[in-house]
Amino acid sequence: MAGSPGNELPLLQLQEVDSSKVGESGGSSGLLPTMYNGALPALSMESHAVCIPSPYTDSSHDYAALTFYSPPILSHGGPAVPESPAARQSLSPSLFWPAHGHHGHVSPLALHFQQPLVYREPAHSPWAEPKPLEHGQAQTSKLAGKRMAESEEGTSSVGGCFAGKGDMHFCAVCHDYASGYHYGVWSCEGCKAFFKRSIQGHNGYICPATNQCTIDKNRRKSCQACRLRKCYEVGMMKCGVRRERCTYRGARHRRMPHIRELAGTGGGARTQRRGEGVVPQTQEAQSSALTPEQLINRIIEAEPPEIYLMKELKKPFTEDSMMMSLTNLADKELVLMISWAKKIPGFVELDLSDQVHLLECCWLEVLMLGLMWRSVDHPGKLIFSPDLKLNRDEGSCVEGILEIFDMVLAATSRFRELKLQREEYVCLKAIILLNPNLCTTSSENREELESRNKLLHMLDSVTDALVWTIAKKGLTFQQQSARLAHLLMLLAHIRHLSNKGMEHLSNMKRKNVVPLYDLLLEMLDANTMHSSRMSASYSSQPSPWSQAAQSQPGPPPSCSGECPCPPKESSTI
């Protein structure tokens, strides 16, 4: 980066600073980085402007492209970019490679995908050739990344400021940015500290109102009783494992090695193209050029193998033993589901945050559909695995699960009536995964729109494959349309069933009936967080029906008597 002696670098003028103000705020962390605070020599402020040479004014380098390089694999050369962990940390989102000691948070699935390739920068780039970070530098980065909370509420609003957009988590209590996974849920520093004080000390809080106070980012301090009640409602547990006090990254690195290595070889071609822009488009071209028959064969090949509980079952079941068996199987299936999704043609071409988000939102629907497919030839039974086959009445030992069993059996019976074929099953499973409504955001940039367009194209391809599968049965056009409609309508039933199952799992977690496994627990919390954020966004938007009612005051028109509306009853409220 050093220029030739003959070329003078342009000068940048620094703003004149009053020395008195510097002395007053010298200990503020807002002026100096944390690791240099108080360690720099005193600066003598004079009355004239200070100018420094700027190596950046004539550079045409696009710094936005650098945000996808990670500090653990880059070495920075030259004085243009200081060799400080703070500088490296600000240029690397934790979505792909979380920095050591980082207080941002990785989505439950982000670490399951392999890190994309990194390519050499152009000659004019100030960055050196990528190479592994030395151990000493990693330790320095870890120390520099640790930020102390200034107060209970002060840092919770900025806990996720370094996290990528697709990597952001919110507090389950107040919906502020979450600083980590604490006491069983994602929470900010403020709510974590409040819950800790409440369970360790005095907690005889009394609500001055009706025990229904709104707890959000701005009003979380208004009522301690309602805040503690909401902490318990979202699943905070007194007996939460002490490891949950650490950041999400620290907990994830203690997971079993085979789960961290599930990513295989597909890290997402989108992230590779961002590094240089010259990555071959072979994989994307192949995925878009597949015929319906080839696409179905690829999806069938991606199907995961059968899993076994591999535990001795004692009957009759108890609530604990059944929930332990079901959650154990679900956790094993989630591990295989990640590999399955990455083998769907075109899935790894999506933005990494979209891949993670899709899996977080549809995982229970995929599990439910798989359960129905295994049980379709066994009327009255649910085949969770070859060594765990349950009758309907065996679910009575678990509170609330009998209703879910009945709904699963009803949907399975409908699939049996339709004589569901394997090709149709795998297409429906892929359609559940590729739901584009799960990736909508309020503000979409060009990259997000590009990823969404790819997702829509993939969904069209899978839908065409499903239509082709139905058409080859020799049915008439009317029969084909009717069968397609019946199959797609069952997806809405599966979504409703998934919501019921998610609610039941959340209740089991709050009651501490059975300890959930790591991956299952993270997926459950991620889905719950997405649902709460979506419901909050919907509630903030006025309904068109309410607007119409406000624009037309007065009693609503009475029914003519021909509609199925129930008769009105006088209200005594």
Curated annotation (Swiss-Prot):
Its biological purpose: Binds estrogens with an affinity similar to that of ER-alpha, and activates expression of reporter genes containing estrogen response elements (ERE) in an estrogen-dependent manner.
Cellular component per GO, a single term: nucleus
Low complexity bias (residue ranges): 534-552, 559-573
Keywords, sorted A to Z: DNA-binding, Lipid-binding, Metal-binding, Nucleus, Receptor, Steroid-binding, Transcription, Transcription regulation, Zinc, Zinc-finger
Zinc finger (NR C4-type): 171-191, 207-231
Tissue expression as described in the entry: Liver.
Predominant cellular place of this UniProt entry's protein: nucleus
GO biological process annotation, one example: estrogen receptor signaling pathway
Expression induction: By 17-beta-estradiol.
Classification via SMART domains: HOLI, ZnF_C4
Domain of life: Eukaryota
Assigned protein family: Belongs to the nuclear hormone receptor family. NR3 subfamily.
Subcellular localization(s) per the UniProt record: Nucleus
Swiss-Prot/TrEMBL domain comment: Composed of three domains: a modulating N-terminal domain, a DNA-binding domain and a C-terminal ligand-binding domain.
Modulating as annotated region, ranges: 15-170
Keyword Ligase recorded: no
Subunit annotation: Binds DNA as a homodimer. Can form a heterodimer with ER-alpha.
Matching PANTHER family: KNIRPS-RELATED PROTEIN-RELATED
Region feature Disordered, mapped onto this chain: 534-573
Protein name, UniProt field: Estrogen receptor beta
Gene Ontology terms for molecular function: hormone binding; nuclear estrogen receptor activity; sequence-specific DNA binding; steroid binding; zinc ion binding
InterPro entries per record: ER-beta-like_N (IPR021064), ER-beta/gamma (IPR028355), Est_rcpt/est-rel_rcp (IPR024178), NHR-like_dom_sf (IPR035500), Nucl_hrmn_rcpt_lig-bd (IPR000536), Nuclear_hormone_rcpt_NR3 (IPR050200), Nuclear_hrmn_rcpt (IPR001723), Znf_hrmn_rcpt (IPR001628)
